[in-house]
Every structure is written in C-alpha cells, then in structure tokens.
C-alpha cells in the first residue's frame, strides 16, 4: 500500500470513530517495567516482559493495517488507557496474553477498535492470577467480540464497563472461565452493550459464581444476556437495575449445569423477540431457581418467562410489572425433581396466547401461586397448573387486585393434584375454574368478585367410588346449579362432595341462590350463611344431606308454590327456614320443604305473608313434608300474623303445618286502647273549671272578670276484649289549660261565662294475650283546642240551675308495636262535645252558720267522634276504626259542704270537700276491625263511678282543687283517675 493510500485509510477510520485530531507519532518509552505510550504510530506495539505496567496517555493513537494495535505478553500485567487514547487495529485492538502467575488488569477510558477480530482479547495460562477489566468511558468495538476473555487460571474474572461495547459478528462481551477458575463477574454501570450474537455471553467452567449486573441497554441478535455455568460452577446471578435487555431470540438466557442457585432480577424492559424474554434452565445438579421482576416489562415472542428446574431445589418467580408471551404463555414454570414452586404476582399484568401462567410440577413438591394483578390467558387458561408426580399439592391464592380471565373461557385449571383455590377479598375471576383429579377445595371468600364466574368444577374424575373429597366453601353471593350450561350470573356447580355456605369467621354475604337442582353429598349452611331458591324456578332438588345452621330461603320471590326437595337427610342446627304463604284457612297456600330422608335437630320457621287475610284453620297449611324418621323439630322464629290471627307451626303425624290460634292478636288491644283514649282524654266537666272573681277597671270603673285555669290528670285504665283473652292496661297523662274570655249577666243575678281551652295528652298501653303470651304496646300523643260556655241561674250563691257546654277539636299521632313486629304509625282526629246541666240546692248548715251543705243532681251528654285513619300494617292487615260515634250519658249526684275555719275569717278562704256518684252509659263500645273481623272493649257500656275531692279558694285570686275517681264496669273494666287543678284570677 502506498503512503498516500495509507493516509487516506487512516483518515477514514479516524473520521468514522471520531478520531481526527490524533497526534503524528506514538512512542512507547520504557522506564524499568513501565511503558508510557504517547502520540501516533501505525505499527503494532508489542510489549513483552515479566511484570509490565503499560500506560497509553490521552494523546496516544495506534492505527495498524495488520496485526494487533497493542500486544502485551507477560506474567503480571497492568494496562491503562487514558481518556482520549485511541487504538484502531486490523486484528485485535488490545491483545493480552498472561503466561505467568500474576494478575491481568486493564483500565480503559478511550477508544479501542478492531476491524477483523476482538476489540480487547485476554488469554491467560493455567497458573495466571485474576483478570480485571474496567472500562470507565469510551468505546470498545470488535468485528468479532467487543471484549473477549479466556481465563484459564485459578482466580476470578471481573469485567466492569461504563461506555459502549460492541461485537459486530459475535458478542459484545464474551467471557470464559476455565475449569480451574472461580468467579466470573460482569458489571455494566452505563453505556451500551451490543452483539451480533449475544450482548453478553458468560461461560463459567470453573468452580465459582457467575454474576452479571446491568444498568443500561444490552442487546444481541440471539440473546441480550447469555449465561452458562458448567458442572463445577456455583451460582448464577443476572441483575438488571435499569435499562433494557433485548435479544432476537432471548432477552436473558441462563443455563446452570453447576451445583448452585440461579437468580434473575429485573427492573427494566427485557425482550426476547422470537423466543422467551427470560429463559432459565437449571440442570439436575443445580439447586434453587429464582426470578424477581421489580418493574418494567418482559416480552417474549413465545413465552414472557420460561423457567425449567430439573434439580431438587425450589423454584420461585415474583413479578411486579408487565409480562407478555406473544405466542406462548406469559410465564411458564416447570420442575422435574421434587422442589417446590412458588409464584407471586405483587402487581402488574401477565398475558399469553396460551396461558397467562403455566406451571408444571413433575414430582412431589408443592405449588403455590399468589396473584394480586391481572392475568389474561389465551387458548388454554388464565392460570394453568399441572402435577405429574405423587402426593402433589397446589395452592392458588387470588388476593386484592387479582383479575383472572382467558380467551378460552377457562380462568383457572389445576389438574392431577390436591388443589386449594382461594378467591379472597378484592379478587375477580371471569370464566371457568376447573379442578382435576384430587382432594380439591375452592374458597369463594367474602369480598371476592364472582360476577364473571361461569363454571366451578371440583373434579374431572367421574368415578363415584373413588376416595377423593372435593369441598366448595361459599362466603360470597353466588347463583347457580348443577344443571346449567354455565354463564355469568348462573354458574355451573359441578362435582363437589361437600358444599359449605358461610362459616364462623365470615358471615356476611354468604349466599347461594339455586337456579336449579344441586348435586352434592353434603350441604352445610353455617350460621350467617343462606341458601335461596331463585325466582326463576319453582321446584329444586338437593341430592345429598343438608345441615342448616343458617337460613334456607324459599321466599325470595313473591309466590307461595315453591318446592325444595332434599333427597337425603335434613338436620337443623338452630337454622332458619324461610317460606312464603298466603295465610288463610286450610285453603291457604305455602312454599314447602320436602325431606325424603330423616330429619333431626331444630329449625326456626319464618313466614312471609303474601296478602293472606287470616282465618281460622282446622288442619292447617302444610309447610314441611317428612318421608323418613321425623325426629327434627320446627318452630316459628317470630310472630306469624295475618288479619286478626296469630299462626303457629304445629306437627301433625310426620309433617308440619301452619295453624291459626283461636285467639285474637294482642295488637287488637292496642288499637282499642288508642281509640278509647282519643275520645276520652280531653273529656271535661263543669267542676274541672271552678270559680272566678270580679274586679273594677281602674280607668272606667267597669266590672270585668278574667282568669286562667290549668288542670293535670293522671289515670290508669284496665279492660278486656270481646274474646276475653286480651288484657289491656294503660296509663295516661293530661294537661289542660283555659280561661274565661267573657262574662255577663242579663238580670244581675244570673251569669254567663265564655272561655277557651287547649290541652296535651299522652296514653301508653300494654296488651297481653292469655292465649299465646304475646304482648303489644300502644302509644297515643295529641292535642286539643276548643271553647266552653257556662250559665248560672244564681251567680252569687251558685244555687239553682246551671248549664255547661264545651266543644273540642282533637288530633293525635298513634303507634302500635306488636311483639316481634314492626311499629305501626297512624293518625286520628275528630270532634268531642258535651252538654251538662244540673240543679244546686242547699240542704242545711251548721249551728254556727260557718258551714253549709249542698246537693247537686246533674246529667251530662257527651258526643265522641274522634276517628283513626284506615291503616294497612306492614304485614298487609287492614285496620279500621269501627266505632262511628258514641253518645255517652252521665247521670249523677254530688254532695258537698262549704265553709271556713274561724281562723280564716276575713281572708277570702273557703273549702268545699265533696263526694260524687255517677252512672255512665255509652251507646257503643270502642271497636276496631282487622281484615273485616271486629273486636271491641267489653264492660264499658255501663260504668259506675265514685269520686272524692276537695275544692278550695286560698284567697281572692287563687283557687285549688283535687279529686280521685274510680270507675268500675263489667268483665274487669276499671278506671282510676287523679286530678289536680289550679286557677288564678286577675
């Protein structure tokens, strides 16, 4: 080659690699065993010695048309290329051969280029010490390998790069440890590594560990990172803390033929375009295999992750990012020789065109899968586990955030092992769950989303004689049967020996709604669990035994002809049976439980009345049919009411019936007590509003009267209804307030009074049924407003005739609360009015003239017409006030004396004790109807009353009065009342 041509080639290479300002001549000066190279040269720099320390400074430039750029041979070698240094060679840029026993150390900060070989090539003898190659910056490029080391010594190989490393036709970094070597370590802290074959290839035939750490981009047309441990090597560690690893076939390929563990840690993107993003194979001699993805995305043209452990060690895969298997599974894991498999998805998404996750355990180890992210399968399943060994156990835990589905419709498939699948709070499964030949358990736990479930199959073995037990635990709301094709909202429940609905720890939302028949050997409804019959079906059969400690509900739809048949035995463990019924007489209808086997234990019965009016029964309405030994007991869990009647659950022969009791409900008494109180609470008589005085207006001298009176009443009432079975007691309080607004006289002797009054009252009652022991409570609160008028024939002496009249408008809020029944609320209002007349005459006086004696016959007519609104109870009973007005007549005689003590002379003080007897007659008893059946208060038509009291004037302005009255009637009717009144005159 001519000198001109050589200059052109050099200039072209320098331009290509950015080296145009190289010095004119390279000179390697020697000082002892140290060489310092500066400037430019076109010849290979061959340096040989025992111990060599070679420094290529920042001005050095070596460019050769043939051979190496720098060739160093010796026993202990240190080569340093400073930043700015350049080597461009036809063969290897730097060729190092350690023929002795010392270490080989390279520190590269410049540019090394090989046009037909390796950028840097290191070969050692079998006795050589460790290799350390550190690239702090710059570029290392080779037509074959960017860096190649062949270490045959007995120590370690350590390669650390921070710049660009490139292998045009082979590997970016190709590192080999011979059989006597130990650890092989490659660390990338920046830059970029690329290779035509592999980005990084590490092969350890020695006895130590192999570790590769990357923080930036690594790529190769076959594998981004390729690691191979031979028979005597120990652990493999590949750790990606950032960046990307990309391979035309594999992103990371690790093959451990050694005797240690294999660990793959990724945080960035890993891509295997035509194969697997991560491919790991542990040979039989190796131990544990672990893959941890802490972020990023792993993509494979086949599988996202493929891990095969032939050893006895355990296999674990943990993911936090996205994993994609474009023509295979997102993650495929298999073992060959008995180790456990643990797969954990902390978050993220895993998808594959075959399975999202595919796990094959060929021996006796356990398989555990924990999912907290999205898993999407293709043609096979979302999660597919298989066991080919003996006594294998598989556990799949779907936790908060889990979302499992597949294009095939099979969300989870687990075959050939004892499998436990847990759908926990926040987990969702769409599609089928298919469990294989094993003792399998599926737990649908509280808070899981089963809305997308279509099939849950406990066993793919149809042999009824095998010893396999499959258990389905439902702690969630689920609808389905054993005879549906399976769809979201109507799940096919297949091949389960034991079905448990609810448990002691999870009692909310544990509901199985049957859309058809259900096959199981044993169905247990735990406390808090519920089994319903869907509104879409009328007749449902349960094939096995049933134990009920929760609720068996046939009454979710408003019809009363559902039938639930239990082919086996039924045992009640204080559970509840809920049925619909049209509560009538014997012609009434009801849902029915049919037990073809035996019954045992105790069951409570709840009845939903669907518009039944209530009637007396003879035989009753059948609700439970028992064809075997009827040792179990059934009893109502609360009140069963319709119209005027209570119903009970009674046994006749082997079967159970609803039968009405021949006694009215106690609520009758509460309605009656409220009706009576509404018409009597504000009833007044003349002497409830005593006296007044006159005063002279200071300005006009006109005589006027004004006053304010108030009375307080407390009373207690007792009565019985027409059946004699309902005993009612009530307590009342009344406060009335009034006063005269006008007073006048026509002849100076008589006196007319006109006044206004208002009041508040409360009455609380309790009714007890002697027939069944039930109670009911009534409560009425209300107000009144009205006026009164009085005429005295003799105002001064209050003798002769008098007439008193009043009229009130009354309104009340009413409540009736039956035992174990909802509170009923209704309104009442109406008019009460009275007309009273009597005659007062003196019968005598004391010797001293201080005391006079009076007799007063009287009669009062009172019209009572406070009516309650028609009311429909929560159970459908129509309640009507059946008393259309009542005229009460009171005929009585009052005897009293009037006087004062000598010490009260001149003090305007007088006292009037009295005794009064009355006969009271009502034209109607208070009456109420329930669904057309009438009941009334008895003993109140004719009542005798005795009243004792005293009326007194304390001074000219203040009057007080009080009395106690006792009324007695037939059939235990009685009323006791105390009154205290006060009046102040202005």
Regions found by a protein language model. Name each.
Residues 786, 865, 874-986:
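Outer membrane beta-barrel transmembrane domains
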Residues 2-4, 35-42, 497-506, 578-581, ...:
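Outer-membrane translocation/initiation segment of Type V secreted surface proteins
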Residues 42-48, 67-74, 92-99, 118-125, ...:
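Glycine-rich beta-solenoid repeat tracts in large extracellular/virion proteins
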Residues 25-74, 89-90, 504-516, 702, ...:
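N-terminal segments that cap or nucleate solenoid repeat domains
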Residues 70, 79-81, 86-87, 94-96, ...:
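Fold-core signature of tandem repeat domains
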Residues 63, 662-847, 963-965, 970-977, ...:
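Outer membrane beta-barrel translocator domains of Type V secretion systems
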Residues 441-443, 450-456, 462-620:
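Extracellular beta-strand/loop-rich repeat segments of large surface/secreted proteins
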Residues 150, 203, 255, 308, ...:
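Outer-membrane beta-barrel pore domains and translocons
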């Amino acid at each position: 080659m001519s000198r001109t041509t050589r200059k052109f080639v050099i200039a072209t290479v320098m331009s290509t690699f950015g080296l145009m300002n190289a010095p004119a001549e390279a000179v390697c000066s020697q000082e002892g065993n140290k060489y310092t190279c500066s400037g430019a040269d076109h010849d290979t720099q061959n340096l040989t010695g025992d111990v060599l320390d070679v420094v290529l400074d920042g001005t050095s430039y070596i460019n050769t048309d043939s051979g190496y750029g720098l060739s160093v041979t010796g026993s202990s070698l240190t080569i340093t290329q400073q930043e700015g240094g350049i080597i461009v060679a036809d063969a290897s840029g730097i060729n190092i051969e350690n023929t002795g026993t010392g270490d080989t150390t390279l520190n590269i900060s410049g540019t090394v280029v090989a046009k037909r070989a390796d950028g840097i090539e290191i070969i050692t003898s079998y006795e050589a010490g460790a290799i350390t190659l550190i690239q702090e910056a710059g570029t290392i490029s080779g037509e074959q390998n960017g860096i190649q080391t062949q270490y045959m010594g007995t120590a370690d190989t350590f390669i650390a790069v921070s710049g660009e490393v490139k292998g045009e036709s082979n590997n970016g970094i190709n590192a080999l440890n011979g059989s006597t070597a130990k650890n092989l370590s490659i660390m990338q802290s920046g830059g970029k590594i690329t290779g035509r074959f592999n980005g990084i290839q590490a092969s350890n035939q020695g006895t130590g560990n192999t570790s590769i750490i990357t923080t930036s981009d690594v790529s190769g047309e076959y594998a981004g990172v390729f690691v191979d441990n031979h028979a005597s090597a120990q652990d493999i560690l590949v750790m990606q803390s950032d960046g990307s690893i990309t391979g035309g076939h594999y992103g990371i390929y690790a093959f451990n033929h050694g005797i240690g563990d294999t660990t793959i840690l990724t945080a960035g993107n890993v891509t295997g375009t035509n194969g697997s993003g991560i491919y790991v194979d542990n040979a039989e001699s190796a131990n544990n295999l672990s893959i941890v993805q802490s972020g990023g995305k792993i993509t494979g043209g086949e599988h996202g992750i493929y891990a095969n452990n032939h050893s006895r060690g355990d296999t674990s895969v943990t993911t936090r990012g996205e994993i994609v298997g474009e023509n295979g599974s997102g993650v495929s894991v298999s073992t060959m020789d008995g180790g456990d498999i643990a797969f954990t998805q902390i978050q993220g998404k895993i998808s594959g065109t075959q399975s999202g996750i595919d796990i094959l355990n060929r021996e006796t180890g356990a398989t555990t899968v924990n999912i907290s992210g999205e898993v999407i399968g293709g043609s096979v399943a979302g999660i597919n586990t298989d066991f080919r060994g003996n006594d294998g156990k598989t556990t799949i835990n779907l936790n908060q955030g889990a979302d499992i589905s597949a294009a095939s419709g099979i969300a989870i498939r687990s075959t050939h092992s004892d499998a436990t699948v847990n759908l926990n709070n926040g987990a969702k499964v769409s599609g089928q769950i298919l469990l294989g030949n094993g003792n399998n358990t599926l737990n649908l736990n509280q808070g899981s989303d089963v809305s997308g479930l279509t099939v849950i199959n406990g066993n793919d073995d149809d042999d009824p004689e095998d010893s396999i037990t499959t258990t389905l635990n439902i702690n969630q709301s689920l609808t389905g049967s054993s005879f549906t094709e399976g769809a979201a909202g109507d799940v096919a429940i297949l091949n389960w020996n034991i079905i448990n609905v609810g448990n002691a720890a999870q009692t909310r939302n544990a509901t199985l709604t049957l859309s058809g028949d259900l096959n199981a050997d044993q169905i247990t409804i735990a406390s808090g669990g519920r089994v319903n019959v869907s509104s879409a079906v009328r007749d449902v059969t349960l094939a096995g035994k049933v134990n009920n400690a929760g609720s068996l509900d046939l009454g979710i739809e408003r019809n009363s002809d559902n039938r639930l048949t239990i082919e086996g035995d039924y045992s009640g463990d204080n559970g509840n049976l809920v049925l619909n019924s049209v509560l009538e007489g014997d012609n009434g209808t009801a849902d029915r439980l049919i037990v073809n086997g035996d019954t045992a234990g105790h069951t409570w019965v709840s009845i939903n009345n669907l518009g039944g009016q209530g009637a007396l029964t003879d035989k009753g309405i059948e609700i439970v049919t028992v064809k075997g030994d009827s040792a179990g007991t059934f009893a109502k869990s609360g009140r069963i009411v319709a119209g005027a009647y209570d119903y009970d659950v009674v046994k006749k022969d082997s079967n159970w019936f609803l039968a009405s009791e021949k006694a009215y409900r106690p609520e009758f008494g509460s309605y009656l007590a409220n009706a009576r109180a509404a018409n009597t609470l504000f009833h007044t008589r003349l002497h409830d509003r005593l006296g007044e005085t006159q005063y002279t207006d200071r300005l006009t001298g006109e005589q006027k009267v004004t006053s304010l009176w108030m009375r307080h009443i407390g009373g207690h009432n007792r009565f019985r209804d027409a059946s004699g079975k309902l005993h009612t007691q009530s307590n009342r309080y009344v406060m009335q307030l009034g006063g005269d607004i006008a007073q006048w006289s026509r002849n100076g002797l008589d006196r007319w009074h006109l006044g206004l009054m208002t009041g508040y009252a409360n009455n609380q009652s309790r009714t007890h049924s002697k027939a069944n022991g039930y109670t009911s409570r009534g409560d009425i609160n209300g107000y009144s407003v009205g006026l009164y008028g009085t005429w005295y024939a003799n105002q001064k002496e209050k003798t002769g005739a008098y007439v008193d009249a009043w009229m009130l408008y009354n309104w009340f809020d009413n409540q009736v609360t039956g035992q174990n029944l909802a509170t009923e609320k209704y309104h009442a209002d109406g008019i009460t009015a009275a007309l009273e007349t009597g005659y007062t005459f003196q019968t005598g006086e004391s010797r001293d003239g201080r005391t006079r004696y009076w007799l007063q016959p009287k009669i009062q007519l009172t019209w009572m017409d406070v009516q309650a609104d028609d009311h429909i109870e929560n159970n459908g009973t129509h309640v009507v006030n059946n008393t259309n007005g009542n005229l009460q007549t009171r005929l009585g005689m009052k005897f009293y004396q009037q006087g004062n003590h000598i010490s009260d002379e001149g003090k305007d003080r007088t006292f009037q004790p009295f005794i009064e007897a009355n006969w009271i007659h009502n034209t109607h008893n208070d009456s109420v109807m329930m669904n057309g059946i009438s009941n009334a208060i008895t003993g109140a038509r004719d009542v005798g009353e005795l009243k004792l009291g005293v009326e007194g004037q304390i001074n000219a302005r203040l009057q007080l009065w009080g009395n106690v009255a006792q009324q007695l009637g037939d059939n235990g009717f009685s009323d006791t009342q105390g009154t205290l009144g006060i009046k102040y005159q202005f």
